[in-house]
From Swiss-Prot:
GO CC entries: cytosolic small ribosomal subunit
Comp. bias intervals (Basic residues): 243-254
Domain KH type-2 residue range list: 39-109
Keywords: Ribonucleoprotein, Ribosomal protein, RNA-binding, rRNA-binding
Name of the coding gene: rpsC
Gene Ontology MF: a single term: mRNA binding
Keyword Ribosomal protein: yes
Family affiliation: Belongs to the universal ribosomal protein uS3 family.
CDD domains in UniProt: KH-II_30S_S3
Protein name in the entry: Small ribosomal subunit protein uS3
Ranges of Basic and acidic residues composition bias in the record: 221-242
């Protein structure tokens, strides 16, 4: 099942969190979900021109305002000179949503292992007539150098402009899709070339998330068990057989 399902959706609530964090009742839910998609599309389209490298947009809603966290490889391109770009973006989103919008920009430390940015980079190269094999292999090498434990890239469509569509993939390292504690980043991007649309899927394995937490829990349980054993030995039995014996005072020499 792990081979077929979306790796991000498969791990939601376990090691991954939702990108829309709010709760509501009634028919307004569908309207707000649609509005979230409009916000994401607008941000990605606007910041794509600035080459900010947006990997993720997290939306949080309160009763008074909307808070948006933008994860970008180049936060300076989002903020702009003296904060001009981010202020304009906030005002435009306030006009679209009808509510006050607050924007925070979070820097992506390693863009080479972000699946969304890898897919967008390959799509950009394919649209500029770069060989798909070269683009895929180069992305894999950069990701493995940056610290990824495994990566797989699949391209499907009229690769190289041929008449018959096909799919090709390259892989390095391991991608444990069935392991829920494995932090697998996934993205799907479309490249619009002269020959037609080419689908790009990227899986990046960044290591296990819960191993340290499980080890800490195990260690804590062992400590508690040892403390219980020590307490039970110290208390002893009710008849005094388990209690510690007192030493008799040494006899004084005459």
């Amino acid at each position: 099942m792990g081979q077929k399902v979306n790796p991000t959706g498969f791990r939601l609530g376990i090691i991954k969190d939702w990108t829309s964090r709010w709760y509501d009742d009634g028919p307004v839910i569908a309207e707000k979900i649609k509005q979230d998609q409009v916000i994401r599309n607008y941000i990605s389209a606007r910041l794509k021109k600035e080459k900010a490298g947006v990997s993720k947009v997290v939306i949080e809603r309160t009763t008074k305002h909307i808070k948006i966290n933008i994860y970008a490889a180049r936060p300076g391109a989002v903020v702009g000179r003296k904060g001009e770009e981010i202020n304009n973006l906030s005002q435009e989103l306030t006009r679209i949503t009808g509510r006050e919008v607050k924007i925070d920009v979070i820097e992506v430390i390693k863009p080479e292992i972000e699946a969304q940015l890898i897919g967008e980079n390959i799509a950009y190269q394919l649209e500029n007539r770069v060989s798909f094999r070269r683009a895929m292999k180069q992305a894999i090498q950069q990701a493995m150098r940056a610290g990824a434990e495994g990566i797989r890239i699949r391209c499907a469509g009229r690769l190289g402009g041929v008449e018959i569509a096909r799919s090709e993939q390259y892989k390095e390292g391991k991608i444990p899709l069935h392991t829920l504690r494995a932090n697998v980043d996934y993205a799907s991007v479309t490249a619009h070339t002269i020959a037609g649309a080419i689908g790009i899927k990227v899986w990046v394995y960044k290591g296990e998330v819960l191993v340290q937490r499980l080890d800490a829990i195990e260690e804590e349980e062992m400590k508690k068990m040892q403390e219980r054993r020590n307490d039970s030995r110290g208390r002893g039995r009710g008849d005094g057989r388990g209690a510690k014996r007192r030493r008799r005072p040494a006899a004084k020499k005459a």
